[in-house]
Amino acid sequence: MNPISLLFLALAMSTDAFAAALGKGASLHKPRFIEALRTGLIFGAIETITPVIGWGIGQVAARFAESWDHWIAFTLLLVLGLHMIYNGIKHDDDEEQEKPGQHSFWILAVTAFATSIDALAVGVGLAFVDVNIVIAALAIGLATTVMVTIGVMLGRVLGTMVGKRAEIVGGIVLIIVGATILYEHLSAA
């Protein structure tokens, strides 16, 4: 795989994570760069690992991954999105929210995994292409880290505009990302 193709692959793999990061940034109370970077690193690490796992699985699991990846991603993002909407409604007057400016590691990791399931499937395909999987995975992870960090900071602007309802907006964004993943896979079938 040539470097230009690898760059486009890395950017394409980071788009779902970028969209989810916009939602995460919108739901945070004035996120600092360090929080955006932390989120980017979590997403980037998971997005680096998933194509390697997919590459290792190979052709046998390709049919399973292709037939279920969109449903798994949609379900995870739907549940996370609904949870964020619920918290946004429930916590309007309740101060028992997570610390302002921070999401838990597990919420970020599950969201990152949900948006990286397509990278798992891509990894399966990369097993049959002349590509150095380590370089490809690192490129995908780096692109995701950068895109997610930017997405969280851009989401901050969105969060400032919508005020208290930012977590609801973030949840809606996650649901839209999940629905888009599902739609793209079903319409291609």
Curated annotation (Swiss-Prot):
GO terms for molecular function: manganese ion transmembrane transporter activity. The keyword Cell inner membrane applies. Signal peptide: none annotated. The keyword Transmembrane helix applies. The chain crosses the membrane at residues 3-23, 41-61, 69-89, 105-125, 133-153, 168-188. Keywords: Cell inner membrane, Cell membrane, Ion transport, Manganese, Membrane, Transmembrane, Transmembrane helix, Transport. GO terms for cellular component: plasma membrane. It is a multi-pass membrane protein. Its main location: membrane. NCBIfam families: PRK11469.1 (NF008546). Belongs to the MntP (TC 9.B.29) family. Probably functions as a manganese efflux pump. HAMAP family: MntP_pump. This is Putative manganese efflux pump MntP. The lineage of its organism: Bacteria, Pseudomonadati, Pseudomonadota, Gammaproteobacteria, Pseudomonadales. The gene is mntP.
